[in-house]
């Protein structure tokens, strides 16, 4: 069952990437760092993360990320999310997100992400953001909050 779920998730990400790559020249890119906190029933920790964002269209953005958790052992999460951007008054943007995740805490597991975020430009090249998402796997469920800054290019 895990293999079927993994294959399905990877196929969906691959298909979305292929479909959206047609629009690559339409959007901007950004790279950012963030800090946050993750909490689960058996795990709570501060985290540091890095992300790359690519606006495939005016409203759809792909966002792969890597988060390192400062627990007693090496813990990290690799995610690939899709954001649907809603501009508000030409400054704020809010977005729901949906994606896939690979977690390495006590065990290695694949799963999904669901959440939302908001961002605000502080200049023509930088923006600040806040995001919350649930990371769901078969044996592990975590809610992660993050605040960050990103550079647009």
Per-range role (PLM):
Residues 131-133:
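C-terminal binding/interaction regions
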Residues 4, 38-40, 152:
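Generic structural motif
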Residues 20-62, 66-68, 100:
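Short glycine/proline- and aromatic-enriched beta-strand/turn motifs that initiate or cap beta-hairpins
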Residues 51-128, 151-153:
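Gram-negative (and chloroplast) outer-membrane scaffold detector with strong preference
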Residues 1-28:
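Cleavable N-terminal export/targeting peptides
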Residues 25-34, 90-91, 148-152:
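N-terminal/domain-start segments enriched in small and hydrophobic, helix-friendly residues
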Residues 36-46, 68-77, 102-110, 135-144:
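Solvent-exposed loop/turn segments connecting transmembrane beta-strands
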Residues 127-129, 141-146:
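A general structural signal for short secondary-structure boundary/capping elements
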């Amino acid at each position: 069952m895990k293999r079927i779920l993994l294959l399905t998730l990877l196929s969906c990400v691959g298909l979305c990437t292929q479909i959206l790559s047609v629009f690559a020249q339409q959007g901007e890119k950004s790279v950012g760092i963030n800090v946050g906190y993750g909490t689960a029933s058996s795990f709570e920790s501060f985290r540091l993360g890095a992300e790359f964002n690519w606006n495939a269209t005016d409203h759809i953005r792909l966002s792969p990320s890597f988060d390192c958790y400062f627990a007693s052992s090496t813990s990290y999460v690799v995610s690939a999310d899709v954001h649907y951007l809603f501009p508000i008054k030409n400054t704020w943007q809010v977005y729901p997100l949906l994606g896939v995740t690979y977690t390495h805490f006590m065990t290695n597991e694949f799963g999904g992400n669901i959440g939302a975020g908001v961002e605000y430009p502080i200049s023509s090249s930088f923006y600040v953001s806040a995001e919350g998402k649930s990371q769901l796997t078969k044996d592990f469920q975590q809610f992660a909050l993050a605040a960050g800054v990103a550079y647009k290019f």
